[in-house]
């Protein structure tokens, strides 16, 4: 968290840890029962805070900490970003980017054994464009999946390709909640600034590109070896190529982010360009963005804000809960325990970060954003103590945290895909266990990320890189 004052405020360990433990425990339980709902999690978090407020012996210090972290720079930055991202992503969808990608895949006339490779790449491109793994899975399960079944692609591989593409965009899209949280929660040692989003994405590109290349190879080989589905003509393939023009705003946002242009300016530039392209080419009208009908207000802009509002509130609640652990001294106790085992080894510190992040991702696999928010303060504290560069911390956090929702049977992304396949009318019988190994990209990225913990580079620690990235 971006708070320079980390002085303990005399909170009892029980009052500090119990609210956080209640929230995490409830989230894990709901994950296993496939009953995760963001609004419910917000309610659970608020109840947990109130319980802590009742049992604390230092009421003033408790509530001061809650409100300070609730409105912290970390929480407010992510909130503003997500609201803008919600608008941006909805405008792209309104511009028929999904239909454009489906059109391109059909015109490429790919064979059934290579269609999974194309599905992975197009799903990844859509995820990078919108920054939404869930949105990608929802869109592609209703479009590319039935198109792939029509040309005879293996259903389990096809589902794995969609999950892999969604995971790809979740790691490197500047507008992804994963990329945002992984960057803005990791502070420099002086505590005065946090890692910039463009720099962190650029830092993990070698890992992501390596895993992506291996994924393409795996999908191609598996597509030739595994049984195929019966091919059939499909009426689901779209002829709307104009939607491909919505890729241009995405390229602008990515390019500006890499050039260290402020992320808010980058996103605004992308939104303006998307609106200009969409209205000029007749993809949508201004009334599709904001529409007033009597007492009702609708449109892509309004829906984009509404779609992000609850997750923003959840973020502020969880940040407040983690603030209690930091201010009570519990965080220092945890770090002291770990330091006795890590000692002065940077590699062991990074492996500890890797392991903690993996455990968090496994336990809270329903919504990776929540797992990311919960573990980020611990990653930040361990990294600062061992002078691990914020870029490197962010890379481990972003590449590891999102693996498990895409592969575990109770993972939110896996369950969403199954629902989308059922709704697509593809008449395919597919279980979550059938796709445990077929999302090649998350598994390969996990291996590449673990390997990177043993490889030194110029962004290994802050003492060897004092530049202002």
What residues fall within each predicted segment?
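Juxtamembrane helix-boundary/capping and inter-helix hinge elements in multi-pass membrane proteins
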Residues: 58-59, 71-75, 152-156, 181-201, ...
